[in-house]
Structures are given as C-alpha cells and as structure tokens.
Amino acid sequence: MDTEYEQVNKPWNELYKETTLGNKLTVNVGMEDQEVPLLPSNFLTKVRVGLSGGYITMRRIRIKIIPLVSRKAGVSGKLYLRDISDTTGRKLHCTESLDLGQEIRLTMQHLDFSVSTRSDVPIVFGFEELVSPFLEGRELFSISVRWQFGLSKNCYSLPQSKWKVMYQEDALKVLKPSKKKASKTDSSV
C-alpha cells in the first residue's frame, strides 16, 4: 500500500480552520464510492453508509493533523489504524514515526483489507508509541488525537496509548551502541 505524507509549518489558527472542514475517508461499498467524514473520537461519531454490496474496502484516506504540541517538546508518534471490534485492536495499518509538532497531511490510496457489511466495523485512527525526550512533552500532549469511523450501534472502548518518556541521557545511551554496530558492519563490507 502506498502512503504519502508531508509535514508543513503554518500558523495554528489557519491549520485549525482547515482541519475543522473535516478529514475525509472514501469508502467503497460494492460498486459505489462514498465519502464520509472522520471526526475526533470524543464526538462519538457514527457514520451511516449505504450498504449496497457485500464488503467494504477503504480507499483514498486523506487526513490533516494539526500540531497539538510545541515543536520544542519533541513529541513523535506513529499513526495507527485499528479495528477495535474486539479487545485485541487488530492493526490494519501503521505509519513511520511522525513529528507531532508540525502539521501532517497523510494520504493513503488503498488499505489492504475489507470487512463484511453485515458486521460491526468500528475503525479507529490514532497516535501510539508516543516518544518525548522531555517529561513536559507528556503533559503537553493532553488533547485526544484519535479519529473514529464506525458502522456500529455498539460503543467500543479505545485502547490506551502507551507513552515512552525518554530523557536525553537515555536517548544518547540508546543511540551510541547502534552507531558502533553500524560502523563495524561498514568496515567488514
């Protein structure tokens, strides 16, 4: 699956206006494409899609994410797409680590999975594996950054995001061994 993303720097108020217009998700049901909004999960939004076919596939997912933390906080994380119809929260897609201090524009052309129109389809987009070199980064990152798309009447609980607060000294300790290993492999080639 091809995933394109870019990170740009704009004033927060401009980004907020853009984002409130709504992140879009194009869903293919049978032979028809239908565009539905993705809203923050704290709105508990449920989207109704005309179920004319047997399976639903996700296509052309476009998400804009405004920075919710200062760039100086150094917070990064991976954007996950999960099916939370059961407790395992099956991973459908995961991006590389992204800087949450900048705007993120994410485009996913096609997701390699489909779900039956007869079943519940609670799909959640959210940041996980959050990393910050400062303890303050954890305090700053207090706003929910999850979006929910669902075809279910039931309520589902979202899996908790795990924080990795890494101090500068620990980060250096982690980096040093990997550099030594890389130099050894380079010299042997």
Swiss-Prot record:
Query: Example GO molecular function term?
Result: RNA binding
Q: Which domain of life does this protein belong to?
A: Viruses
Query: Where found, per UniProt?
Result: Host membrane
List the record's Gene Ontology CC terms alphabetically.
host cell membrane; membrane; viral capsid
What post-translational events are described?
Phosphorylated.
Using the UniProt record, give the first listed, main subcellular location.
host cell
The record's keywords, sorted A to Z, are: Host membrane, Host-virus interaction, Membrane, Phosphoprotein, RNA-binding, Transport, Viral movement protein
One Gene Ontology term of the biological-process aspect is: transport of virus in host, cell to cell
A Pfam entry, by short name: TBSV_P22
Give the similarity note.
Answer: Belongs to the tombusvirus/aureusvirus movement protein p22 family.
Q: How does it assemble?
A: Interacts with host protein HFI22.
Q: What does this protein do?
A: Cell-to-cell movement. Displays RNA-binding activity.
| Name of this chain's protein | Movement protein p22
